[in-house]
Amino acid sequence: MKKLPIFLLICLLIGIVACKETEDYWTQYEQWRETNESWFIEQLGAKDEKGNPIYTKVVPSWDHSIYVLMKYYNDTSLNRDAQSPYQTSTVDVIYKGMLYDGTPFDSSYLRTDSIYRTQVKQNIKGWIIALEQMKVGDSC
């Protein structure tokens, strides 16, 4: 019976040590943040060979403090009358996620079925913003 309090004390000490904060994430990822922000600013001003912006800055109506950069690979004027999904819509997406330096980090092509079916609102904010902006048939 005397072993139970000692066991509980050891568990408490392990819990305290395990929960100790080691480093502030803001400081830990400072270099990554600065590189990422520099890339975004550079891309906002990037132009193609005809002088047109390469990326479109998209700010959602529901939060003006965030935005995404979208690069369309198709002629969006051809899909102008097509439907856009709502946050409650279910969409089929084929995607390849890449870091700013072109390093791939995720892809639907790595799955058995390359189509990723999801409800728009179940994704990260960047995807929600982009998907709500896209029309059926768009490629970004």
Predicted stretch roles:
Residues 1-19:
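Sec-dependent bacterial lipoprotein signal peptides
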Residues 19-140:
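Cross-family detector of peptidyl-prolyl cis-trans isomerase
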